[in-house]
């Protein structure tokens, strides 16, 4: 009995000695988020704009003109209506470079990719090395299609009578904005990973240039200012607003007398909004009717083909 007790005490002592001899493992004092910070990838460096650099491949030309010829022959990029551009070609291609290399978006459909090479491959593979200059496009801000013959004959005169400076160049307001010589501000929202739906929404919600009111000088400033507010004809309107007013007046003239009388109590802006909404709804109805008619014609052609197939004789005559 005494021997068993002695053996047990010896075993306990040996175990305590082993535990005390085990080296202490140092605690991990590294912050939990250090691995996350170290593993996070650095943002992709945006290449600076070079006039001779192709937007879709690594080929570099000596001048911008040679690069434009290469992009047109190799990739199909064409700049239409260059006479109506409000900026020089270098500034326009600088904005295209911003869209592709900074925001990694397709020029044609607005599809976003994670890298520049991916969006370049998308555009070359889909044939999207082009851009839209329609009214609802963001590239329409670089064009001015509404110059009248009088404005073209005046040459170097602005709307307010001041002389134009042909050497004026766009100003880079910040990394995402550019002010054109006409006073328009072209900006791109900082959404490098934006979805195509956000791109389409940005195109639809593109803001227009506010109206600029002329401020007369003289002793009767208050009287003239009140007259300008009451009469919109004295305001300096943009060409787009003039065109919208002319279109609304044309559509209003084509309405019946009853419809025009029903709109007389509304303001001019409300009339234009209502006419535009009605026009869009009419166009949508026409498209739906045409689509339904095509489906009906297609179904009729299938039934006619099946009918004549079954009417053929099973066995040849004779």
Swiss-Prot record:
Segment forming the signal sequence: 1-21
Protein's UniProt name: Core trichothecene cluster (CTC) protein 15
One GO BP annotation of this record: ribosomal large subunit biogenesis
Lineage: Eukaryota, Fungi, Dikarya, Ascomycota, Pezizomycotina
Keyword Glycoprotein set for record: yes
Physiological role: Part of the core gene cluster that mediates the biosynthesis of trichothecenes, a very large family of chemically related bicyclic sesquiterpene compounds acting as mycotoxins, including T2-toxin. The biosynthesis of trichothecenes begins with the cyclization of farnesyl diphosphate to trichodiene and is catalyzed by the trichodiene synthase TRI5. Trichodiene undergoes a series of oxygenations catalyzed by the cytochrome P450 monooxygenase TRI4.
Gene Ontology cellular-component annotations: preribosome, large subunit precursor
Sites where a glycan is attached: 254
Keywords: Glycoprotein, Signal
Superkingdom assignment: Eukaryota
Pathway entry: Sesquiterpene biosynthesis; trichothecene biosynthesis
Biased composition regions of type Low complexity, renumbered to the chain: 1-22
Reported induction: Expression is positively regulated by the trichothecene cluster-specific transcription activator TRI10.
């Amino acid at each position: 009995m005494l021997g068993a007790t002695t053996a047990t005490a010896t075993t306990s002592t040996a175990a305590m000695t082993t535990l005390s001899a085990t080296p202490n493992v140092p605690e991990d004092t590294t912050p939990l988020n250090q691995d996350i910070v170290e593993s996070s990838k650095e943002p992709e460096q945006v290449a600076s704009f070079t006039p001779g650099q192709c937007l879709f491949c690594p080929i570099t030309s000596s001048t911008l003109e040679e690069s434009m010829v290469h992009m047109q022959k190799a990739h199909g990029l064409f700049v239409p209506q260059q006479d109506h551009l409000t900026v020089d070609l270098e500034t326009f291609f600088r904005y295209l470079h911003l869209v592709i290399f900074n925001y990694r978006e397709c020029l044609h459909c607005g599809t976003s990719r994670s890298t520049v090479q991916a969006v370049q491959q998308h555009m070359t593979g889909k044939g999207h090395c082009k851009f839209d200059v329609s009214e609802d496009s963001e590239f329409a801000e670089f064009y001015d299609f509404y110059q009248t013959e009088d404005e073209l004959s005046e040459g170097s005169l602005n709307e307010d009578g001041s002389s134009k400076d042909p050497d004026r160049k766009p100003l880079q307001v910040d990394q995402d904005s550019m002010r054109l010589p006409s006073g328009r501000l072209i900006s791109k929202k900082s959404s490098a990973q934006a979805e195509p739906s956000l791109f389409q929404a940005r195109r639809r919600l593109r803001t227009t240039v506010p109206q600029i009111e002329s401020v007369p000088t003289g002793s009767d400033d208050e009287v003239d200012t009140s007259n300008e507010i009451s009469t919109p004809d004295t305001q300096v309107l943009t060409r787009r607003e003039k065109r919208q007013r002319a279109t609304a007046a044309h559509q209003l003239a084509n309405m019946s007398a009853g419809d025009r009388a029903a709109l007389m109590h509304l303001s001019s802006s409300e009339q234009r909004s209502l006419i535009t909404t009605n026009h869009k709804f009419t166009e949508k109805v026409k498209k739906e009717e045409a689509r339904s008619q095509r489906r009906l014609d297609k179904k009729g052609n299938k039934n006619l083909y099946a009918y004549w197939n079954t009417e053929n004789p099973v066995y040849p005559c004779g």
